[in-house]
């Protein structure tokens, strides 16, 4: 043992391995007793995710560090009890529900643009995380995504590229992008349509060609004595359906080899260009009125319809002494018949020659024939 007058030599052992017998330990006169509890750990509560830096309050922190006191150990082949504090790095799994609550309060709740393949004719659409996160909250074991936002984003993007909605099962869905036009602006909206519900184009064409044209009976042609095949004119319900049929436009003399494949149409066209120009009227009706929800194929038709809600009446009768105004042009044309006396709609029943300026008045009149017949 060295004397008290000898100088004390300090050896630095940091980052070096020195045999225990090389280091000479100095005994201590007094040892302070410290009560220790084994396996006691104090941790700092933070929010974050496993395997990444901790995020709390908008700042990033290093991985969680716990200070853990251990019982005395014999490091130098001696029996001296000493208090020793070591720094131990460990991982703590924070429940993903807390992470969800944090994300819902941040900009992750806003909408995210999903990339879409242009070859699939899909426009960029939007999806929000809030709906998925609310469904997963509190269902860690049952959640199909396991609280992993990256995995959920991958599923959504893959579904958008393939035209399949990941939240609608195994069915094949086709995405359609529509535009809701309101009085204050336009609002994009994405819709999904089940491909299994699409009709066979051949069957649609055959059904369209078999539909007869009854519009001629509304403009002067009389019902035949034997009646109309397939329609009981004495049945008020069938007669009402007859009056609701839309008239067909007259066809020209040139050949029309190309048929429209939409169900219930069956129109023929001279070439593919004319058919494609016509095909857009079958939808989808992407221009939707924000006031009443009525949809239109063309934006011009929607703007004309919105005049009903705004109260604007740009169409005015030009007859002297009248000056009435209308929101729609065809209402003005119908009104003008009052001044001209034109009544193009004639009752089709035999021995009845009543004429009307509006088709709605004729349809109401036709139903009176059945009512009078049932009263007799």
UniProtKB/Swiss-Prot annotation:
Zn-finger segments (C2H2-type): 258-282, 287-309, 315-339, 345-369
InterPro entries for this protein: YY1-like, Znf_C2H2_sf, Znf_C2H2_type
Gene Ontology MF annotations: cis-regulatory region sequence-specific DNA binding; DNA-binding transcription activator activity, RNA polymerase II-specific; DNA-binding transcription factor activity, RNA polymerase II-specific; RNA polymerase II cis-regulatory region sequence-specific DNA binding; sequence-specific DNA binding; sequence-specific double-stranded DNA binding; zinc ion binding
Cellular component, GO, one term: chromatin
UniProt cross-references to Pfam families, sorted A to Z: zf-C2H2
UniProt similarity note: Belongs to the YY transcription factor family.
Protein's UniProt name: Transcription factor YY2
Organism: Rattus norvegicus
